[in-house]
Amino acid sequence: MTGGAPRTETQCIETDAPVEAVVAVLADPTRIPQWAPAFADQVRSDPKSGWEATKDGREFALRVATNEDAGTVDYLRQVAPGREGGAYIRAVLRPGGGSVVTMTLPLLPDVDPADTAATLARELATLTSLAEGS
């Protein structure tokens, strides 16, 4: 690895759910608390920003960039003036059926990378469970 300490955590998981089912769960931001409670306790539509999320009583604008044809959904928020960051999620066709879901998260300076990795693994497992039940 070059460039010092890692700045992101990326994991993937295989599922029997088709790409369309995974993207359907991801494209509905109100479902984020079901599978990613570490990110948001609640997400609601906001006429100004599109979406507003709440975590531990703090509200933040959330931009959801979805490309259903490409199987991508990104959840973005302002991390510094003029800069966005967040979760970058891809669902691709798995040979033989189902899909492979990959998510990349930024590593926060005050959070142990092992904790981020464990949270991401739980989130992916819950996400694919929801997609399989769709």
What are these regions (language model features)?
Residues 18, 56, 69, 94-98:
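Short strand-connecting beta-turns/loops that link adjacent beta-strands
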Residues 24-37, 70, 122-133:
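Short, intrinsically disordered, mixed-charge
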Residues 45-52, 68-76:
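Short, hydrophobic/aromatic-rich segments at coil-to-beta transitions
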Residues 12-16, 63, 90-92:
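Generic structural detector for well-ordered beta-strands
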Residues 1-44:
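Hydrophobic ligand-binding cavity/cleft-lining segments
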Residues 22-26, 32, 51, 64, ...:
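Hydrophobic pocket/interface hotspot
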Residues 76-134:
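Beta-strand/loop substructures that line and gate deep hydrophobic ligand-binding cavities in soluble
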Residues 8-10, 57-61, 83-88:
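Short, surface-exposed coil-to-beta transition loops
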